[in-house]
Amino acid sequence: MKNLFLISLLVSSFFVNSQEVPDPIRAEYLMCNLNDEKSMYDFMQWSKSWNEVMDATDESGYDASVMVPRYRTPLTDFDMFWVGHADSSTNLGKALDNWFGDNFKEVRDSIPVTCVQAFNAVQWVLESNFSPEDLSDAYPVSYRYCNLKEGKTLADAFINLSNQMKISHKAGIKNGARLIAPCLLY
């Protein structure tokens, strides 16, 4: 029985170590506050204009989500944060060029928020077991701050998280995940 367990353990270890880690996508995070006398309704109306111009002019594949903190702490002293994604730094740069271009001037000048902090990150997108159609316009997202253990890499973290996701999917739990690191770590 020990030999069977050892063979099983070796095969499992080989699978974990041989799993390929995909290239990360690029993301920008902007923490924003509503301008005086502006509301979330104003922002949502503005986002329709943003979507129209992006749909007509974007060639970078940029997409964005807006998130609202559920709890307030000194670290979340903002009304919302904008998370924009592109598949590469080049395409994130193209999206930024588009934002500062003439097509976006009217939308840019009418934005009802002021962004007070920003950072760029890389994200490894893990396999989810649901489709966008399964989601409503509002759904919970949890962020967890983690430190790598000594001798471990972001690839190790990806493989570990990927294996945890597979276990939860087999148990019928619908979820998805991203491993996020500030650009200076990658």
Feature roles, as predicted:
Residues N3-S13:
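Sec-dependent N-terminal signal peptides
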Residues S18-L185:
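Short S/T/G/P-rich N-terminal loop/turn motif that feeds into the first structured element of a domain
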